[in-house]
Amino acid sequence: MAPMRVDLLTREYPPEVYGGAGVHVEYLARELRRLADVRVHCFGAPRDEAGVTAYAEPAALAGANAALRVMGVDLEMAAGTAGTDVVHSHTWYANLAGHTAKLLHGVPHVVTAHSLEPLRPWKAEQLGGGYALSSWCERTAFEAADAIIAVSAGMRRDVLTAYPAVNPDRVRVVYNGIDTAQYAPDRNTDVLDRLGIDPARPSVVYVGRITKQKGLPYLLRAARELPADVQLVLLAGAPDTPEIGAEVEELAAELRAKRSGVVWVAAMLPKHEVIQVLTHATIFVCPSVYEPMGIVNLEAMACETAVVATATGGIPEVVADGETGLLVPIEQAGDGSGTPLDPERFVADLAARMNELLADPDRIAAFGAAGRRRAVEHFSWDAIAEQTIEVYRSVGG
């Protein structure tokens, strides 16, 4: 009997990976290949990898709205899935491809909810009228999908709130994972030396894109309260909008004028370099105001680094408060934006949690060791692949 053919549909795939969804698809594809015939359909430049097809934006849509160009890629992608047993789409960028393939080829469509357009209303700044298109693509796909995989229980709740037409029985929780063989402590310092990070000084590290949801401006304000000897290391690039890019630039310049040790790396670093920075971090900070799961927290934990993170979305399912890190309380607007109701209090609480942990080296070490154990025991990719295959089987894949 031929193995099940699974077609994964995604905007991001190595080497063009910008966020957690791209990391997820990379490792899911790798592990699923042990269990199924996996084909990957992605955006961008041609890939050398067998079983991977990349799609460029249609030339006829050059200059059109960004969301419209995405939809053009999706239609080509749907055509490329002929012969599959099940299609599995990731993020709104590929949801239309999955939905169209379901209708065109009569195959089940599984969607993974990494984030939700209704909970990111600020994206209207990026996409203009295209935000209505991205929201339509996602809603249409979710409401018709044979199964929806939520990357956390928090995300499952959000899916059912955002899309009340979805049958709760079709929404399963399968967590994001971590490759704990790759994400493991690296005690070397060559990368730190090159980036200008002093391994002899404590460091607070942030890794992520510059978007409203990631909350970097709150961290930059909270960093004013850090002890003078603590470095602030930002592996942060790709601002979503010129406005947030300018805000972060201004806050960073203000901070640099008052303290030393502010290291900002705007370029996307290869994984092994990020791992070394995470390993040497005294604490890793995730100030997100919207985070369905926060795979970056897992990456830090796997590197034996204590975490300070916002108690929002799926983060409390990853970061065990008082065991692998400290959670920062937050009261948020109910409009889906995640905006703190009291931004000054959130900044003060973030600063307080960072300073509480920085003052306790024994606790930092204990949290780091416990974080590594938790990552290994609960978030392995082989288990996630098995659970995902079960979802495919349940819908007749």
What residues fall within each predicted segment?
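Nucleotide-activated donor-binding/catalytic signature segment of Leloir-type glycosyltransferases, i.e.
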Residues: 245-268, 272
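Aromatic "clamp/platform" in nucleotide-sugar-dependent glycosyltransferases that forms part
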Residues: 289
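Short hydrophobic beta-strand element within catalytic cores of glycosyltransferases
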Residues: 306-309, 319, 326-327
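Carbohydrate-associated surface elements
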Residues: 154, 177
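Short His-centered aromatic/hydrophobic patch
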Residues: 89-94, 113
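A conserved mid-protein helix/loop that constitutes part of the nucleotide-sugar donor-binding site
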Residues: 23, 202-225, 246
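Nucleotide-sugar donor phosphate/pyrophosphate-binding loop at the beta->alpha transition
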Residues: 107-108, 118-140, 157
